[in-house]
Amino acid sequence: MIAAGRDALAALVAEFLQASLDRRIELTRRFRAGEISKEDLPRDVLISLCLVDDWRHADDVDKIPYVWRQCALFLSGSIKTTSHSLPHVFVHIDEWVKEHPEDRANLTDPEWLHRASAEAFRLHQTTPARFRAALRDVTLTSGRQVKAGEMVALHAPVANVQAEVFGEDGRYFNPRREVPDGMQPWGMTFGLGAHACLGRNLVTGIQNKGDDKHGAQGTAVRILKAMYELGAELDPDNPPRRPEGSLHDTWESVPMILRKA
């Protein structure tokens, strides 16, 4: 699997990224020479790395070059949460409306879909744990001590079902859930502070709202709304299927029918 991933990245570099990097290196040279203004530069990760001369590192000869690792990170970050979570949302909503048929009328309501997608994000993380190396000795509020250089992991699944925050039914999907002020409805799924996911707003909406009045809806709500407007429902003859030989919290197949397409 790792070899296949490396081959895919190599193909991406050869077909798209190398030419893009070469162009941005040249644009950076022209910008520094005063031939073009900053407004003439594209706004993307590659140009940002070129402008601060951070597109190559000393260890590039020993591993996948730094610049391609950054490109792969942003590509994965821009699509992984959406592609991982939406199947979970569809399955959860199907189960929910069977038990709460009155909510079927909300399937095209952006705010309701925002709540539903937030619940799925909370319950099904693409990356259950985030690892960091401690920069200094620190004592956590629990009293646990972490030494400088020690690796620690933020384990989101446990935090995301804490009864004190999400209620006694926190382990279950509930688009009607209310969370305390200051808490995100998706819990720790996207991280927090300096370690927050850079692509969160792309998925959840700019201001974390699902309605047009308060901000962009985000990719999850837009896709869900478009699908339900086309009469999307799970295929009764082909139920969702989990992957075999893996404990990863994902779906291998979620067949759907668009009744109004």
Q: Regions from the language model: what does each represent?
A:
Residues 86-93, 117, 155, 207, ...:
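Buried hydrophobic packing segments
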